[in-house]
Amino acid sequence: MQAAHPIERAVGMEYYVSDADGVGGRLRSSPADFRVRELEAFDTEPVDADTGAYPHLVFRAELRNWETNDFASKLSDRLGISRERVSWAGTKDKRAVTTQLFSVKGVAAGDLPEIGGTDIEVIGRAGRPILFGDLAGNAFEIVVRDTENTDNAASVVADLRAFANGDDSVTSEGWSSDATLPDGDTTVGVPNYFGQQRFGSRRPVTHEVGLAIARGEWKDAVLAYVGNPNEREPESTQEARGYVDETHDWAGALDRLPGALGYERSICHRLVENGASEPADFREALEALPSNLQSLFVNAAQSYVFNRILSERLERGLPFDRPVEGDVVCFRDSDAPEDFPIPDADRTQEVTAKRLSTVERHCERGRAFVTAPLVGTDTELGSGEPGDIAREVLDDVGLEQGDFDLPGAFDSDGTRRAILLRTDLGVERDSADLTFSFSLPKGSYATVLLREFRKGDPDA
């Protein structure tokens, strides 16, 4: 186990589980180096089905260098319809080639426009829109270019294979200095951290905003979002955010904040209008943001706490592949593909001493998964040492479960999430480039696996 990069530690990912040195290299040298294909889980009727019963046209789109929201906005503009009539199952990053399903209400197949950087294939019709989460997972093919030590990849694979199986024999020197890349796929495992994208890749602050909101510190939440300069931003943006931190002059901030920072400017406009004299004024300014962004702040705070819980579990040497007394496990989704087990966070059970050996067998056979809380008002924290870890992390960030009883879109009941991410990984070497092929359940991050190989700046 090694200490992670400082940017990763700032969002709760405190360790790499692999002791082997990294390969370095660059991610996303071009969009084609990061390919994502949805593993679809949405049924459709034929394209010529009755439009009254099946008003939603479903199509598969390959997007090249398109962020999902931007494509949906462009599509709705070209169709002359509300953006709310376009739906999809999962949001994908821009600098990639992505293949995913969309649905559009009240549109004929022939109405779909040609849009640069996209290929569209009509699939059929449906009686309801595609909803967020209507997928089994995602298949990835990712190229890391210009690695500094390609040979290290084999040792990382060996370490991650051991972690997936709960093997404690990895040493501080790494698994094997003379390891070779296996032929075909190898089952590997990593902690199921929330990746850097959850918090902001270049400026990871969304969790800071969410933590302040959960504490009821509304002004601090605004300052964390509008102020709080980051060295990776343009100098003019850093100066504008620094001005906010120093002066709390919202009118002056509007003169300095770039037009591209639309949400920050919206907050400042609202504060100029309401006087910014009471905590409720700052809450009102945040509530003026889109509801999905409000939820994102609190979700990022929950994700940060989750990452901290996983890091503490690593620090204490507790297993990830099997439970200890006091853990809460969830069971396999009965609707998941036979060869692609997916955890069902709605079916949980706390592990008692009496049930420990039985649940261990379920985990070994892929029928159950150890979980940790995404803390909200109704989350079960567990007991024993796992419960202690969750409560200690909450105490360290100054929160209690009841703090997530928040107004409107900020409110969250919480849930649970599997702590071990397993996948069958293929690695191919071409000179100094490495190509990684694997599939992950929905909600898990490819970069969380790749960070174990690169071991460096996640934004490089």
Curated annotation (Swiss-Prot):
Source organism, top-level taxon: Archaea
Q: Which UniProt keywords apply?
A: Isomerase, tRNA processing
Q: Which enzyme type, at the first EC level?
A: isomerase
Pfam families from the entry?
Answer: TruD (PF01142)
Q: Reaction catalysed by this chain?
A: uridine(13) in tRNA = pseudouridine(13) in tRNA
Enzyme Commission number(s) of this protein? 5.4.99.27
Q: Which InterPro entries match?
A: PsdUridine_synth_cat_dom_sf, PsdUridine_synth_TruD, PsdUridine_synth_TruD_CS, PsdUridine_synth_TruD_insert, TruD_catalytic
* UniProt xrefs under PROSITE patterns: TRUD (PS50984), UPF0024 (PS01268)
What is the protein's given name?
Answer: Probable tRNA pseudouridine synthase D
Q: Name one GO molecular function term.
A: RNA binding
- What are the disulphide bonds in this sequence? none
Species whose genome carries this gene: Haloarcula marismortui (strain ATCC 43049 / DSM 3752 / JCM 8966 / VKM B-1809) (Halobacterium marismortui)
Report domain TRUD positions.
Answer: 189-421
Q: Where is the active site?
A: 93 (nucleophile)
Family classification: Belongs to the pseudouridine synthase TruD family.
Q: Name one GO biological process term.
A: tRNA pseudouridine synthesis
Function field: Could be responsible for synthesis of pseudouridine from uracil-13 in transfer RNAs.
